[in-house]
Amino acid sequence: LEKVRYVDAKVAFNQRRHFFSDWAEGDHKVVSDITAQLSPHTVFVNKQLNKKSNGDPIIATVKITPRVISYVPTRFIDRALLKQLKTGDYIGIYSSASGLDVTHVGVVIREGEKVIFRHASSQRKNLRVMDVELFSYLQGKSGIMVFR
């Protein structure tokens, strides 16, 4: 996880990959964005990561970064797409906010035909790592990005 979240696995704020899509970008990318390979319904959105609607940065010490974000809308996530997911794939829950790529991140765990979303819940009643079926978790969410 340190290798994924931090450039050269150096745990420091200035080495942190602050946005999910940072993991698959640049000279130090550690995963590949496979989202578009999973569905013909993939949507591509131009975003200005770290930019608030008023133009200010969300995180003052992090630069605003233009990026094309790909995601599969939830309504197109079906059995065929779920069958392509593998244990260890990273799932980002797409954010419609202009300065963000995702709202939450987790890892795929396959249990036979079940696709489990392992994530750290921030809900007050949970505050722990949880396993939930991905399809159920996605109800009411915009869509997903998938990295491998």
Residue ranges of predicted features:
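Short alpha-helix capping/helix-loop boundary micro-motifs
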Residues: S70-L81, S95
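C-terminal soluble interaction/assembly domains
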Residues: I91-F147
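Short linear motifs in intrinsically disordered
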Residues: L81-K83, V107-V108
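Acidic/His-rich structured neighborhood in mature extracellular/periplasmic domains
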Residues: L1-I69, K86, G92, R110, ...
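Generic hydrophobic, helix-prone segments enriched in Leu/Val/Ile
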Residues: V72, L85, S136-L138
